[in-house]
Design a protein with these regions (language model features):
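Bacterial N-terminal signal peptides that target proteins for export
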Residues: 1-9
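C-terminal outer-membrane/trafficking sorting elements
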Residues: 3, 19-22
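Bacterial N-terminal signal peptides
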Residues: 9-18
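Serine-hydrolase catalytic core recognition
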Residues: 212, 274, 428-657
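Extended, charged, solvent-exposed helical/coil segments
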Residues: 385, 421, 429-432
Length: 657
């Protein structure tokens, strides 16, 4: 055969492959592929259930459990599901369908904990035997297993139980052992075991005085009415007490905190010796927080260790944490210098004389004893991961804007492992081992959906890469993403934006724009993580030919207290002004069709969508508001009054917003 003939055959053989690649590269992801819950949703690879057993990393799978040495990354098989199920069947304890839900709460014991058919099972994976089983009563909810004592707290209906014993017997309208204050102030549970498991602190919420509102279920053939107690801004709120239950005696006491009317109790924690219970009390106006100590045996107050006041609001969200090597010292998180940072406190300060000082954030604070600020800078501590006792260090995660990373601060000399400025744009979370020497670092970047590394906390360098996930949309036609900053309506503050352009973008064309907005507290839409925080819906609409634009206005999170509380008593107003600045930026772009700009958002974003449509009808041609807050007077007491005060004290603000 001639060379020309061979070349022709090779070309023909290559054509289908080339056509197939071209077809794949021009394929746009569907809504089902982009939205979680879709039947064909494409997600990045992950390692589920990754955790520590003491200082060994545990990697579960469906059928096999592996341990990973953090220094080398070497994997060793620990046990198989088949081995466990054989023993479980012999004990008539059921079967595990996978190993992802297994946990290792005992750092010094070869034991794991899992749950089958409502039973908590402790299993020794060295001797291959069931150590213990514990089954709460039927209907159990809010389960809280204590690894130190082997007891489990839970609720049935509105009452609290420990093991099989009822701790409370309250009528309808009084709820025990569940979250209170509408899950504000960092509250996400209602029971708190002491370090050794000898005592259980719990919430008791009396909401019998709160107005009931009917929710009608129309999905049934005959409609049903379910009443919910919902305290709206300015109205009567529920009253909370904190109890302490002793499983050994079966008796409970309640803290003698005084009249609970218009007071919030949050951030509950124990002293290492279980003799004291600590909590942070916030007043109804939410402008005064007090760290209080109580006697765990009698419930009597032992003193106030710290107070923080601000003319706008204070919002404590983290319980104190004691140093594992010194039970007389604890870590307190505060925004008193304008950013959330770590402070070292003396636990004996309740008996000391204190003074009041002016804080850098515009408020004041009262403290007794010696207090040392451990972290400082125009960035925030977002999570305390734990301690390295040998090096006397606190390991934590920090964030500011699009950058985040892990750090260590030495409690003795205040030295931090690296400057925050070394952080790159990314989104990190971490899990520390028992000794604080290594951590599991999960993070993403704009172009990388997920990376999981084991990291040495001595220098925060990777020792083993466990996963580098590829984009689940490799080969698809994807939009391009740009980020940058513009000035807020105050003319000085930088705001981060994300601009998503359709694939095959043509700068000579005019494109319609959808502004996706949230804009409220405790949320950041533009991040340094995967696709800069863009959602699948954004990608889908970009595929339909829209430019997608998002800006984090003042009032959103991870930029410091002044950035967040700039919207105080005027929710939606200042945020709206910043969103308009974003639109002005859009209109400066030659490829934006300024006559076709829409806005969309959910929840607080629904409120923003409605407000923008009504206040700036000349800008936005269409708006879609999902679950919007239309009138802040109908929102809950805790959230609404923090940012707006009461309708009685701020009538013009409520009317304007």
């Amino acid at each position: 055969m001639s060379k020309i003939g061979k070349r022709a055959i090779l070309l023909l053989l290559a054509l289908p492959i080339g056509f197939n690649v071209m077809a794949q590269e021009t394929k746009k992801p569907t809504l089902e592929e982009l939205i979680p819950g879709g039947e064909s949703y494409r997600y990045a690879d992950n390692l589920y259930g990754l955790q520590w057993w003491g200082d060994e990393c545990i990697k579960p799978g469906v059928d096999t459990l592996y341990s990973i040495q953090p220094k080398t990354g070497k994997e060793t098989m620990v046990i198989t599901r088949e081995q466990i199920n054989k023993v479980l069947e012999e004990n008539k304890a059921g079967k595990l369908s996978h190993l992802y839900s297994v946990s290792f709460p005992w750092a010094d014991k070869p034991q794991m904990l899992f749950k089958i058919a409502g039973k908590f099972i402790v299993y020794d994976f060295k001797s291959n035997q069931v150590v213990s089983t514990l089954k709460p009563k039927d209907g159990a909810d809010n389960e809280d297993y204590c690894a130190a004592s082997g007891n489990v707290a839970y609720t049935i209906g509105n009452n609290l139980y420990v093991n099989e014993k009822a701790v409370t017997n309250e009528p309808e309208g009084i709820v025990c052992g569940q979250t209170v204050h509408r899950n504000e102030f960092g509250i996400n549970k209602g029971t708190f075991w002491s370090p050794k498991g000898n005592l259980l602190a719990f919430y008791r919420m009396d909401e019998s005085m709160v107005t009931q509102y009917p929710l009608v279920d129309i999905t049934a053939r005959v409609g049903e009415v379910n009443n919910v107690r919902y305290p709206m801004a300015g109205m009567t709120s529920h009253q909370v007490k904190v109890g302490i239950y002793n499983p050994a005696t079966g008796k409970s006491i309640y803290l003698n905190a005084g009249d609970p009317t218009d007071r919030y109790f949050t951030n509950i924690s124990w002293s290492p010796d279980e003799k004291s219970l600590y909590l942070i009390e916030v007043n109804r106006d939410q402008n005064h927080a007090k760290l209080c100590q109580y006697n765990a045996e009698t419930g009597e107050p032992m003193g106030v260790l710290y107070e923080e006041m601000h003319p706008k609001y204070v919002e404590p969200q983290n319980a104190i944490v004691f140093l594992p090597w010194d039970p007389t010292k604890f870590i307190y998180q505060s925004q008193r210098d304008g950013y959330n940072h770590l402070y070292l406190f003396d636990a004996n300060a309740a008996n000391m004389k204190g003074e009041t000082y002016n804080s850098a954030n515009g408020g004041t604070y009262f403290q007794a004893g010696k207090v040392k600020q451990l972290t400082k800078g125009n960035w925030l501590v977002s999570d305390v991961l734990g301690f390295n006792t040998k090096r006397k260090e606190i390991i934590f995660t920090a964030v500011e804007g699009l950058r985040s990373g892990h750090f260590a601060v030495n409690v003795s000399n205040g030295k931090i492992s690296q400057p925050f400025e070394n952080c790159k744009e990314s989104e990190h979370s971490g899990m520390l081992n028992a000794s604080g020497t290594y951590l599991i670092d999960r993070y993403s970047t704009k172009d990388q959906p997920r990376i999981i590394n084991l990291v040495d906390t001595k220098n925060f360098k990777e020792t083993a890469n466990l996963l580098t996930a590829e984009s689940p949309y490799e080969g698809y036609q994807m939009p391009s993403i740009e980020t940058g900053t513009i000035k807020a309506a105050d003319g000085t503050t930088d705001l981060h934006y994300r601009l998503m352009k359709p694939a095959n973008f043509d700068p000579a064309k005019k494109y319609p724009v959808i502004v996706y907005v949230y804009g409220g507290p405790h949320a950041q839409c533009v991040t340094g993580g995967w696709q800069n925080g863009a959602r699948g819906w954004d990608t889908y609409m970009a595929g339909k030919g829209y430019i997608m634009f998002t800006i984090d206005n003042r009032g959103s999170s991870n930029r410091g207290l002044a950035f967040e509380n700039a919207t105080f008593r005027r929710l939606g107003i200042e945020e709206g002004k910043d969103q308009v600045k974003g639109v002005e930026f859009l209109k400066s772009l030659s490829y934006v069709d300024s006559e076709r700009i829409g806005v969309h958002g959910w929840s607080f974003g629904g409120h923003m969508t409605t407000a923008l449509m009504l206040r700036y009808p000349e800008i936005f041609k269409v708006g879609v508001a999902g679950g919007p807050v239309i009138d802040w007077g109908y929102y809950e007491v805790m959230y609404g009054e923090r940012y707006m005060d009461t309708p009685e004290s701020n009538p013009e603000g409520y009317k304007e917003c």
